[in-house]
C-alpha cells in the first residue's frame, strides 16, 4: 500500500516539473475529465504520462493551427472584398433614389413631410428627462420646455411656496414632471471624493504578479510570535544577523526569489477592526494551533472571523516537537468546525511545524506560495499608489508616522497623499528593515513620514496631484465624517428588521450567540437557523460560552450582526463599545423568548412593550450572616446607583445565577432609598442567601415603551 502511495505525484509537483502554473494544470485536468480537488491532490502514474504526452504533442497542433489561421485569413479577405463591392453598389442605388425623390416635386415633399411628422410623433410618445437631487424651478422649466410660472402655480397648489430661482428636491420635481407626461431619471452625480478613492479597473496587460499579504492568527501562547520569528530567521542573511531589525508592523520574507509579506498585527482583533473599517488587506491567513492544546476558544473566534471575511486559510499545527503533541486530535477538532484537512479528503491545508526547533517552516512557506499562485494575485505598478494604513503613531522627533501597505501602483517620496481625514506629503520612506527607500511597489509595507495628523489603522490612502488638493479633499472628508457621525451607519436591530426585509436591505440576518453552557449555544443555533425562509436567512456567525466581550462586539460591527446572550451579561467595556458601534445586544433567560422575538421580528409583529434601564452595579466585598435575616452583602457601588425598589440580578463570572428584588438597603445601619457610585452599603436579596465575595449585583428597572 505504501509503495503505491510513493509512486503518486501531487498536482503542484507535476506543474513545477512541466514549468507551468498549478492553476493552468488544474484547468487542463478538468478538460481531460481527470477529477482532482486542488493543487494538493495526487495523480496516478498513467495520468501523469498522459498529460506529459499531450503537452509534448501541443507544439505540432499549434503549427497546424497556424496553417489553418493563414487559410482562414485569406478566405476572410476575399469575403470582405465582396462585401465592400456590394456596399458601394447599395450606396449608388441610394443616391439614385434620393435624386428621383428630389425630382418628384410637391407630391414627394408632402410624403417626406408626413414621414418626418410620423417619426417625431413616435419620439413624443416617450419623453424622458434626467434631473439631479436638487435643481431650481427655472432649470426644471428649461428641461421640460415649459413656462416657469406654470410650475410655480402647480407648486403653490401643493402648498410649496417657491420663486423661480429657488431649489426643489428630486421627489417634488419628479411629481411635477409626471403631470406634464415626462418619465424621470435620477442623475448620478459622482462625488469627487468617491471618484478618487474608487480604483479604476486595470487592463490585463498592465497587471503584474504581486507578493501575497499574510496575517498570522491563533490562540494566546500557541506560538504566533515564535512562528513569525522562525520565518524571519530562516530568511535573515549573515550580514543582517548582527543588525537590529526595525519593527514597522509588517515584514517581508523572500522564498525561492519570491516575496511574502507578513503582517505583525496583534491577532484577530486588529484583523476584524480593519475589516469593520472596510479595509481588506489580507490575502491569506495562517492559523496557528498548538499540537498539545488543540482548538481553543480564540482559535474558534479566529476561524469565524476568517470565514466571515472569506479569506483562504492555512493551518500551522505548531509545537509538534513536544512529547504531548497530538496533531491528529487537532485535525479531528478542526474537522468538527468544518475545516477538513486535505489528507482526510477536505480542502484545508494543514502543515505540522515547530517554531522552536525550526521544523516544517520551509513546507509552510511553500504552501503559502502555492495558495498565492492559485489566488493569482496581481496589481498595476505603473500608476499612482493606493493602499491601506496598518499602523500609525506619533513619534518624538518624527511627528505622525504611518505604516502603510501599497495595494496598487507605486508610492514615491514627494507624493501628496490623503488617508481618512488626514493628508500630507511623503517626506521620507523606510522599508521593513529600517532602510531609507525612494519608492515602494504593490504589496510592499513601508513606514512613511509627512502626515498632518496621525491617521487611523484601516484608513485607505491614495496619491493625489498635489498637497493643496490633498488638503481640500481631507477637509471635505472631515465634513462628510461629521454628517456620518450624526446619522451613524444603521446596524440591524430586531425592531426594524421587518421594515428592512420589506425594503430589501436585509437578505441575511447575522447572529452571534453567547450562552452559559455549550448545550444552550447549540440549541439556540439550531432553533434560529431553522427560522430561515425565502426572504431572510439567519446565519449564526459565532457561538461560544461566556460573557459578551469586546471581540464579540467588534465581530458584530464588522459583520452587521446582532448579539443574543442567554443567561450571560456583557462586560462593561463591551457594553460601552456596543453603544458606540450601535450594535444591538439582546439578553434572554428563556430560549423560547429569543426564538419568538426573532420569529416575530421576521413577521413584522415585534411589539416592544418594556425596556430594561440599568441603574447601577455593585461589587460584593464581604458577606455578613445576620441571625433571623440571613446573609447580607457588604457592597461597593462601582457605577450608577443602587435603589431600594429596584430589580436585581446576581452575576458570578459573567453568568447570571439569580434574579429577584432587593429586600433591604442599608448604609451605616440606616435604611436608605438609594446609594450612589463610590459609596459602600449593605444589600439583602429577597429569597437568596448564596451570595459570595466577588459577585456583581446589577440593579435595574423595567420601563414601559410608549407605542
From Swiss-Prot:
Composition bias type Basic and acidic residues, residue spans: 55-80
Broad class of the protein's primary localization: cytoplasm
All residue ranges annotated as the tr-type G domain in the record: 209-378
Gene Ontology molecular functions: GTP binding; GTPase activity; translation initiation factor activity
InterPro entries: EF-G-like_DII (IPR053905), EFTu-like_2 (IPR004161), IF2_II (IPR044145), IF2_N (IPR006847), P-loop_NTPase (IPR027417), Small_GTP-bd (IPR005225), T_Tr_GTP-bd_dom (IPR000795), TF_IF2_bacterial-like (IPR000178)
Record keywords, A-Z: Cytoplasm, GTP-binding, Initiation factor, Nucleotide-binding, Protein biosynthesis
PROSITE patterns in alphabetical order: G_TR_2, IF2
Gene Ontology cellular-component annotations: cytosol
Binding site for GTP: 218-225, 264-268, 318-321
Residue numbers spanned by region G4: 318-321
Record region (G3): 264-267
Family designation: Belongs to the TRAFAC class translation factor GTPase superfamily. Classic translation factor GTPase family. IF-2 subfamily.
Protein name stated in the entry: Translation initiation factor IF-2
Native source species: Caldanaerobacter subterraneus subsp. tengcongensis (strain DSM 15242 / JCM 11007 / NBRC 100824 / MB4) (Thermoanaerobacter tengcongensis)
